[in-house]
A protein has these predicted regions:
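Conserved glycine-rich cofactor-binding loop
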Residues: 13-16
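Conserved glycine-rich Rossmann-like NAD(P)H-binding loop of the short-chain dehydrogenase/reductase
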Residues: 31-45
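Conserved NAD(P)H cofactor-binding loop of Rossmann-fold oxidoreductase domains
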Residues: 87-93
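Substrate-binding pocket helix/loop in short-chain dehydrogenase/reductase
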Residues: 95-108
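Active-site helix of classical SDR
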Residues: 119, 155-156
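Residue(s) in the substrate-gating loop at a strand-loop-helix junction
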Residues: 139
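C-terminal helical subdomain
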Residues: 179-180, 195-232
């Protein structure tokens, strides 16, 4: 009896936070991962722990040329991709009393443009993959505006729109698209968040739950609905 080959997945933002937790879960399940992050050391540590399962493709995903080269390296090593998980991104909080447009430029470049570069590099590989699946992360702040998240909300709304439009465009090509909205997860990116977080997920639990839901390939995976009462009164 032939064995089902392990899925080949490109995971961005794998050096820390949700990305690192997703990588841990996926590698433990036997998947083969192409891991991207700016910091190489965490990726090397995973490669040492899971020999033969990790393809190291670090780089600056805001640099379109570097992303093209990453795509070429994955193609040379594997020939195709079964999944792309777009997790890389940043979260910046802005005080409206000192609004700084350079912050939204940074957020858009790091989150929206980098995701677009990765999609461009991966689509030829996904078309050649086995039941291909594109997973993009867009924050729940697109549904629930919070203080100091104007820039994050605008960028993540763009991400969500891009992913949902791609779902329509890529369906005839056999590529499924899922938008993942994790909500509050216990990562360093929420340390500056000074609003109540009534349903703050532990990192490992969030990663396991996300992957369980993603396997079903729904259009959207949103963590448990927020208890709105926990947000009032808002801080002054």
């Amino acid at each position: 009896m032939s064995r089902t080959p392990p899925r080949r997945i490109w995971l961005t933002g794998a050096g820390s936070g949700i990305g690192a937790a997703l990588a841990e879960e996926l590698l433990t399940s036997g998947a083969h991962l192409a891991l991207s992050a700016r910091a190489v050391a965490p990726l090397q540590a995973l490669s040492a722990r899971f020999p033969g399962q990790v393809l190291l493709v670090p780089g600056d995903l805001t640099n379109s040329q570097q992303v093209r080269e990453i795509g070429e390296r994955i193609g040379e090593a594997w020939g195709s991709l079964d999944s792309l998980i777009l997790n890389a991104g940043t979260c910046e909080y802005v005080d409206a009393r000192q609004h700084d447009s350079s912050i939204i430029e940074h957020v858009v470049r790091t989150n929206l443009l980098a995701s677009s570069y990765c999609i461009e590099a991966s689509l030829p590989l996904l078309r050649a993959g086995n039941t291909p699946h594109l997973v993009g992360i867009a924050s729940s702040v697109t549904w629930l505006p919070l203080p100091r998240t104007a820039d994050n909300g605008a960028c993540n709304s763009g991400l969500r729109s891009m992913f949902e439009s791609l779902r329509i465009d890529l369906a005839p090509q056999g590529i499924d698209v899922t938008v993942l909205s994790p909500g509050f997860v216990n990562t360093p990116s929420i340390d500056e968040n000074d609003v109540p977080m009534p349903q703050n997920w532990p990192l490992d639990k969030a990663a396991r739950h996300a992957l369980e839901e993603i396997q079903r390939r729904p259009p959207t995976v949103a963590f448990a609905a927020l208890n709105m009462a926990g947000f009032w009164p808002l801080p002054k």
